[in-house]
């Protein structure tokens, strides 16, 4: 009989095989649809589909709705100022969604459902379980699949007539021009500052509206950049990037899935208004702020174009894409990147801790938040000491007795091994004669190297 680990491996293999087969079927079905469309249009290359490089070829403009279109979109066709012409504009439009996460999934879902003719999906990442509470296009069966492919499967089940191209890569200064130039509207559904500056500059250069959304914890924001004569770009509002230590993504700060659903849906709404026209005032020069704790929306006016903006002024300094990771001093992904703040003798490998120190007398401080500490603890001896209490020195009184013993080793841990280094730095400044070390890689490393059954989040 197979052991537990072998059974888990076989389960993972079967899930991946099923996901690969579904992806292959999806691609074959789309290829069949494209061939049928080409035959219906008399053959040739005027089908408006993506070429090998991912660019959308300009092709035949659709001038009438099919019976299926009328049945499918009837509820929006009867809207004032929408009608047949509005639906045709959607049918002939192309939209690029950057990031198939909590914002990109609802945005893509509503744009595909509304009848946008061509969707481009960009994401470098794969589906994992931590996505499901907010990234509603992905499923358990598609764990490990590229997010773009997973989203395409779901979107084509929703609307088989939508043409979709997957860019399963990280957008950067080298590929952005080739990808973005052929789309009508771009949605920023990313989760990092470097990508926001990249998309902004590219949209200014190629004269594309940029529908920008963000969500963190219980709050969300939405605006449209680079739209209209006086509509500002992202650099008009934020000419200088924030310091890296001031930036928090949803992986670190958390987010409620329903909040991303609200903002992503509103991104789809603004995109439809831009494409159709006449449906109301586009959210350019204004920012919508959503507070999920109160359910309140605020609509505030933001500054107009900055006359000396480096990107969108009459004499811009930025006429080509630059190295945005260098410019922002941070990575262009929402993945956690390990800090290196401590010397090697101030750090401890999780395996070494498990083998040599775990059973010995020591203080084990867990500097995660109280909410995170409630999720899981490394041991019953772990003491929750949130990082904020370390930085404001309030822990000194709380642990005055324990800290008097210089011979008692102090081990500090966190989720991924970054906050623990910050805490150790601060504590060693206070107690230079104490043995204070952090656990390299935190709880994630513990799961990888010591106990694969320990919960990871």
Swiss-Prot record:
Q: Where is the Rhodanese domain?
A: 358-455
GO MF, any single term: molybdopterin-synthase adenylyltransferase activity
Enumerate the catalysed reactions.
[molybdopterin-synthase sulfur-carrier protein]-C-terminal Gly-Gly + ATP + H(+) = [molybdopterin-synthase sulfur-carrier protein]-C-terminal Gly-Gly-AMP + diphosphate; [molybdopterin-synthase sulfur-carrier protein]-C-terminal Gly-Gly-AMP + S-sulfanyl-L-cysteinyl-[cysteine desulfurase] + AH2 = [molybdopterin-synthase sulfur-carrier protein]-C-terminal-Gly-aminoethanethioate + L-cysteinyl-[cysteine desulfurase] + A + AMP + 2 H(+)
Cofactor binding, per record = Binds 1 zinc ion per subunit.
Residue sites binding ATP per the record: 102, 123, 130-134, 147, 191-192
Task: Locate the residues binding Zn(2+).
Answer: 233, 236, 309, 312
Q: Which keywords does UniProt give here? A: ATP-binding, Cytoplasm, Metal-binding, Molybdenum cofactor biosynthesis, Multifunctional enzyme, Nucleotide-binding, Nucleotidyltransferase, Phosphoprotein, Transferase, tRNA processing, Zinc
Which Pfam families does this one have? Rhodanese (PF00581), ThiF (PF00899)
Instruction: Give the E.C. number(s).
Output: 2.7.7.80, 2.8.1.11
Q: Which GO terms describe its biological process?
A: Mo-molybdopterin cofactor biosynthetic process; protein urmylation; tRNA wobble position uridine thiolation
List cofactor names only: Zn(2+)
Enzyme type, top EC level? transferase
Q: Segment Disordered: which positions?
A: 40-60
Superkingdom, according to UniProt? Eukaryota
Where can this protein be found? Cytoplasm, Cytosol
Q: In which pathway does it act?
A: tRNA modification; 5-methoxycarbonylmethyl-2-thiouridine-tRNA biosynthesis; Cofactor biosynthesis; molybdopterin biosynthesis
Q: Which residues carry this modification: Phosphothreonine?
A: 63
Q: Which GO terms describe its cellular component?
A: cytosol
Active site per UniProt: 250 (glycyl thioester intermediate), 414 (cysteine persulfide intermediate)
Role noted for this protein: Plays a central role in 2-thiolation of mcm(5)S(2)U at tRNA wobble positions of cytosolic tRNA(Lys), tRNA(Glu) and tRNA(Gln). Also essential during biosynthesis of the molybdenum cofactor. Acts by mediating the C-terminal thiocarboxylation of sulfur carriers URM1 and MOCS2A. Its N-terminus first activates URM1 and MOCS2A as acyl-adenylates (-COAMP), then the persulfide sulfur on the catalytic cysteine is transferred to URM1 and MOCS2A to form thiocarboxylation (-COSH) of their C-terminus.
Family as reported in the entry's similarity comment: In the N-terminal section; belongs to the HesA/MoeB/ThiF family. UBA4 subfamily.
Q: What is this protein called?
A: Adenylyltransferase and sulfurtransferase MOCS3
């Amino acid at each position: 009989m197979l052991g537990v680990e072998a059974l888990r491996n076989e389960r993972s293999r079967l899930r991946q095989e099923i996901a690969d087969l579904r992806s292959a079927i999806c691609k074959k079905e789309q290829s069949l649809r494209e061939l049928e469309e080409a035959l219906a249009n008399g053959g040739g290359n005027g089908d408006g589909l993506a070429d090998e490089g991912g660019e959308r070829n300009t092709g035949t403009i659709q001038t009438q709705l099919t019976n299926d279109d009328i049945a499918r979109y009837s509820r929006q066709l009867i809207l004032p100022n929408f009608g047949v012409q509005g639906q045709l504009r959607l049918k002939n439009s192309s939209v690029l969604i950057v990031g198939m996460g909590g914002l990109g999934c609802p945005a893509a879902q509503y744009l595909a459902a509304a009848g946008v003719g061509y969707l481009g999906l960009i994401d470098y990442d794969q589906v994992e379980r931590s996505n499901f509470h907010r990234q509603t296009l992905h499923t358990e069966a598609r764990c490990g699949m590229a997010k773009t492919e997973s989203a395409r499967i779901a979107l084509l089940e929703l609307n088989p007539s939508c043409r979709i191209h997957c860019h399963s890569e990280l957008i950067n200064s080298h590929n952005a021009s080739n990808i973005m130039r052929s789309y009508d509207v771009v949605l920023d559904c990313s989760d990092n500052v470097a990508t926001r500056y990249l998309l902004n500059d590219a949209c200014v250069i190629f004269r594309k509206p940029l529908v920008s959304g963000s969500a963190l914890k219980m709050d969300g924001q939405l605006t449209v950049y680079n739209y209209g004569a006086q509509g500002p770009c992202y650099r008009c509002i934020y000419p200088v990037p924030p310091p890296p230590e001031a930036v928090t993504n949803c992986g670190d700060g958390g987010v409620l899935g329903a909040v991303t659903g609200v903002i992503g849906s509103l991104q789809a709404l603004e995109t439809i208004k831009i494409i159709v026209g006449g449906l109301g005032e586009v959210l350019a020069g204004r920012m919508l702020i959503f507070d999920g704790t109160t359910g309140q929306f605020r609509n505030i006016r933001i500054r107009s174009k900055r006359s000396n903006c480096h990107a969108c002024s009459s004499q811009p300094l930025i006429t080509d894409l630059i190295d945005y990771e260098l410019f922002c001093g941070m990575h262009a992904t929402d993945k956690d990147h390990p800090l290196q703040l401590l010397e090697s003798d101030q750090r401890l490998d999780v395996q070494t801790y498990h083998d040599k120190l775990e059973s010995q007398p020591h203080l084990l401080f867990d500097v995660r938040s109280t909410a995170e500490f409630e999720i899981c603890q490394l041991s019953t001896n772990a003491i929750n000491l949130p990082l904020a209490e370390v930085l404001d020195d309030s822990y000194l009184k709380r642990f005055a007795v324990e800290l008097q013993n210089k011979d008692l080793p102090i081990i500090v841990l966190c989720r991924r091994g970054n906050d623990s280094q910050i805490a150790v730095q601060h504590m060693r400044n206070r107690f230079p004669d104490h043995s204070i070390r952090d656990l390299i890689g935190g709880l994630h490393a513990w799961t990888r190297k010591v106990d694969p059954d320990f919960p990871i989040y």
